[in-house]
From Swiss-Prot:
Its EC number is 2.1.1.199. Belongs to the methyltransferase superfamily. RsmH family. GO terms for biological process: rRNA base methylation. This is Ribosomal RNA small subunit methyltransferase H. It is found in: Cytoplasm. GO terms for cellular component: cytoplasm. Its main location: cytoplasm. Keywords: Cytoplasm, Methyltransferase, rRNA processing, S-adenosyl-L-methionine, Transferase. It is an enzyme of class 2 (transferase). S-adenosyl-L-methionine binds at G47, G48, H49, D66, F93, D108, Q115. The gene is rsmH. It catalyses: cytidine(1402) in 16S rRNA + S-adenosyl-L-methionine = N(4)-methylcytidine(1402) in 16S rRNA + S-adenosyl-L-homocysteine + H(+).
């Protein structure tokens, strides 16, 4: 099987991470389920993982969820060749409940490559765009509104809590000073430049951009990412058939710690991966963003009758 699976539409060009590992995990389902079952792709994005699953397992159907209307449009186009085996809904997974038990729930957390690579979405500190960062650009508070509303202390606490940024106090002070002196930032690059200026000179040119942690913190807060993940971790085991699988790919330590703790303590689940699955050297060379991906998998324990 090829290491690279590329999904391309007019608006989405995304290489799903740990795709081969996902296929191998699905093979752990009972044989009778693989022949005829339903799985939930809780973060369908451009449809890359689901496309590979549907192609590999003719007996499996997928319900795909995403709160990003652009992702839903891309996935719908990409998966239309599978007919009624693929159904897609525009919703956050925390608001969803299936009408029947399913064989697997899968979630690929965080921001997709198309969202990062489209400056107008406001996620990127390398491509200029408005300070937005909302997964669903129709609803909710954007990044510009958030940093304007919070006090310096509240902003520093947010950056430290969700970004684990050691210079959070310095960064928050600079942001609030700039807003008071010159008004809103012109875009993402202006904010990233201000953040970089809060780092000691010797730390500004490392592989990880100085704005990475602050942008992560703002994005997590704006989209309530850890809150909705906690909801999924609580609800998903109830959606599963006995011996059904629950797989989550995370991209930073805050997400991974939540998933790890849930899989360890939830009595409805047993881990089938003691350590997280990570990308191969070959995959990382093809898709550098897979470097930080970790997949944890658990199985639904048979409920006591």
């Amino acid at each position: 099987m090829k290491d690279k699976v590329n999904v391309a539409t007019s608006t989405f060009n995304h290489t799903p991470v740990l795709a081969n590992e996902l296929i191998e995990i699905i093979k752990k389902l009972p044989e009778d389920l693989i022949k005829n079952c339903l799985i939930i792709d809780a973060t369908i994005g451009g449809g890359g993982h689901s496309s590979l699953v549907l192609e590999t397992f003719p007996g499996i159907s997928v319900i795909g969820l995403d709160q990003d209307p652009k992702a839903v449009a891309a996935a719908s186009e990409h998966l239309k060749i599978f007919g009624d085996r693929a159904k897609i809904e525009t919703t956050n997974f925390s608001n969803f409940t299936p009408s029947k038990k399913v064989a697997m729930v899968f979630a690929d957390l965080g921001v997709s490559s198309p969202q990062l690579d489209e400056g107008s979405r406001g996620f990127s500190f390398r491509l200029n765009g408005p300070l937005d960062m909302r997964m669903n650009q129709i609803d909710g508070t954007n990044a510009a509104e958030l940093i304007d509303r919070l006090s310096e202390n509240e902003l520093a606490n947010l950056i430290f809590k969700y970004g684990e940024e050691r210079f959070s106090r310095r960064i928050a002070k600079r942001i609030k000073h700039d807003l008071a002196k010159q008004g809103p930032y012109s875009g993402t690059i202006a904010l990233a430049y201000a953040i970089a200026g809060c780092y000691p000179p010797k730390l500004r040119n490392r592989r990880v951009h100085p704005a990475t942690k602050t942008f992560q913190a703002l994005r997590i807060a704006i989209n309530h990412e850890l809150d909705v993940l906690s909801v999924l971790l609580k609800k998903a085991p109830e959606w599963l058939l006995d011996d059904g699988l629950f797989a989550v790919i995370s991209f930073h330590s805050l997400e991974d710690r939540l998933v790890k703790k849930s899989f360890l303590t939830d009595t409805r689940l047993e881990r089938i991966t003691r350590k997280p699955l990570i990308a191969t050297t070959n995959e990382i060379s093809i898709n550098p963003r897979s470097r930080s991906a970790k997949m944890r998998v658990a199985r639904r324990i048979e409920a006591i009758k």
